[in-house]
């Protein structure tokens, strides 16, 4: 019996708070929870419940994250908040909390600070598509001109990293005052919620994206041909569809002549399902684990890319020593390890466990990839890092 399907009447959107330490990310998270629960119904979460973030493990990396949910009249939001800067870095790089949009919190008493910049850069690198600014602690600034100055600074900083700094919404408010129930500041939280609704477009569901299945196994069935198995990552494949086999070697085209799930024949395989795909005229040796089956033209194989990487600390089971240029680990994409070489940024001689770093990777064979694809860095099967493809070079 298949599990009951998770049906929601309203569209579901993933967001999160980012910004410098002590600028009020967690207070804002609590304020949104309270004001929206009070206005539209739902359960309010307190600061202490959010601040006490449970520890999670994502690909062997320990991350502290708080997840809360809230509703506006038109949408359901899942919101992530992290206690420490390192948690943000890990969260964004591993994709543990994929964000459809982020709320950048900037204290108007301080203006943009080092982590403000770093979180904007990370958002750009890992592909957070939209940023909305909440200028916090505005109740503590009497000077209107000072607020304007801070807003200008934040907008310029966002433009510097290719976000539309001039056009994105900036809300001036006070999370603490809103949490204390002061109507003029509660109104600012509702303004922020309205900005989330209008500025972040409804995300495309996995099922509506072009078909892609990472190949895990290949079988030959006498009299029927070759079957590849795996979990459909996105889209739908139907019997009779033309598909491409991409990665590792030259791309080839074939046709899906059958879809099987739990030994039953189906007309189609959909995102999230584990299935076997029968391929016309394909030999057992033409396909291997590590390739993907995809809608023709939807994804290309690449070998060289810029990435943002988090290197596991010794405590997380990572390396005990730094690595240098010339380091040649394995890069694990979807279902397979590929050896690659790295190029460190100018002036960087070595990378310490626990660091995050931008690096250019060149693989020894091509892998089907898009910007935003996550990977692990491994040494002999042990994970020592996590990364994301920021920009494809070749």
UniProtKB/Swiss-Prot annotation:
One annotated GO molecular function is: translation elongation factor activity
Domain tr-type G positions: 10-204
Region G1: list its residue ranges. Answer: 19-26
- Keywords for this protein: Cytoplasm, Elongation factor, GTP-binding, Hydrolase, Magnesium, Metal-binding, Nucleotide-binding, Protein biosynthesis
Q: Which residues bind Mg(2+)?
A: 26
Q: Where is this region: G2?
A: 60-64
UniProt keyword annotation of Phosphoprotein present: no
**Where are the annotated segments for G3?**
81-84
Annotated region (G4) at 136-139
> Which Pfam families does this UniProt record tie to the protein?
GTP_EFTU, GTP_EFTU_D2, GTP_EFTU_D3
Instruction: Tell me which domain of life the UniProt entry assigns to the organism this sequence originates from.
Output: Bacteria
Q: Where does GTP bind?
A: 19-26, 81-85, 136-139
Quote the subcellular location field of this record: Cytoplasm
List, alphabetically, the InterPro entries matched: EF-Tu_GTP-bd, EF-Tu_GTPase, EFTu-like_2, EFTU_2, G_TR_CS, P-loop_NTPase, Small_GTP-bd, T_Tr_GTP-bd_dom
Q: Which reaction does it catalyse?
A: GTP + H2O = GDP + phosphate + H(+)
Q: What is its EC number?
A: 3.6.5.3
- Single GO cellular component annotation? cytosol
Q: What class of enzyme is it?
A: hydrolase
Q: Report residue spans for region: G5.
A: 174-176
Functional summary from the UniProt entry: GTP hydrolase that promotes the GTP-dependent binding of aminoacyl-tRNA to the A-site of ribosomes during protein biosynthesis.
Q: Which family does it belong to?
A: Belongs to the TRAFAC class translation factor GTPase superfamily. Classic translation factor GTPase family. EF-Tu/EF-1A subfamily.
Q: Subunit structure, briefly?
A: Monomer.
Listed name of the protein? Elongation factor Tu
Q: Which organism is it from?
A: Shewanella putrefaciens (strain CN-32 / ATCC BAA-453)
């Amino acid at each position: 019996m298949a599990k009951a399907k998770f049906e929601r009447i309203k569209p579901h959107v993933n967001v999160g708070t980012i910004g410098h330490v002590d600028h009020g990310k967690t207070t804002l998270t609590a304020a949104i929870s309270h004001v929206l629960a009070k206005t539209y119904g739902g359960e309010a979460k307190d600061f202490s419940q959010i601040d006490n973030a449970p520890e999670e493990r994502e690909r062997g990396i320990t991350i502290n994250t708080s997840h809360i949910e809230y509703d506006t009249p038109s949408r359901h939001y899942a919101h992530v908040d992290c206690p420490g800067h390192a948690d943000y870095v890990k969260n964004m790089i591993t994709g543990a909390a994929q964000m459809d949009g982020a709320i950048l919190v900037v204290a108007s008493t301080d203006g943009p600070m080092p982590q403000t910049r770093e979180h904007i850069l990370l958002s750009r690198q890992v592909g957070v598509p939209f940023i909305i600014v909440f200028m916090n602690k505005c109740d503590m600034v009497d000077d209107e001109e000072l607020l304007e100055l801070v807003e200008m600074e934040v907008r310029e900083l966002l433009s510097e990293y290719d976000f539309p700094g001039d056009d994105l919404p900036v809300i001036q408010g006070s999370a603490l005052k809103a949490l204390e129930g002061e109507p003029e500041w509660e109104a600012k939280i509702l303004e922020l919620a309205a900005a989330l609704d209008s500025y972040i477009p409804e995300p495309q569901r996995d099922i509506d994206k072009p078909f892609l299945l990472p190949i895990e196994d290949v079988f030959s069935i006498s009299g029927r041909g070759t079957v590849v198995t795996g979990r459909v990552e996105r889209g739908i494949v139907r019997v009779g569809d033309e598909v491409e086999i991409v990665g590792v070697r030259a791309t080839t085209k074939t046709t899906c002549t059958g879809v099987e799930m739990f030994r039953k024949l189906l007309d189609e395989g959909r995102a999230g399902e584990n299935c076997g795909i029968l391929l016309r005229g394909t030999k057992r040796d033409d396909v291997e684990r590590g390739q993907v089956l995809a809608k023709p033209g939807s994804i290309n194989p690449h070998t060289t890319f810029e990435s943002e990487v988090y290197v596991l600390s010794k405590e997380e089971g990572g390396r005990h020593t730094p690595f240098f240029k010339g380091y040649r680990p394995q890069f694990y994409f979807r279902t397979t390890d590929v050896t690659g070489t790295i190029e460190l940024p100018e002036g960087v001689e070595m990378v310490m466990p626990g660091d995050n770093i931008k690096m250019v990777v060149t693989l020894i064979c091509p892998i089907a990839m898009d910007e935003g694809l996550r990977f692990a860095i491994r040494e002999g099967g042990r994970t020592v890092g996590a990364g994301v493809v920021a920009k494809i070079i070749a």
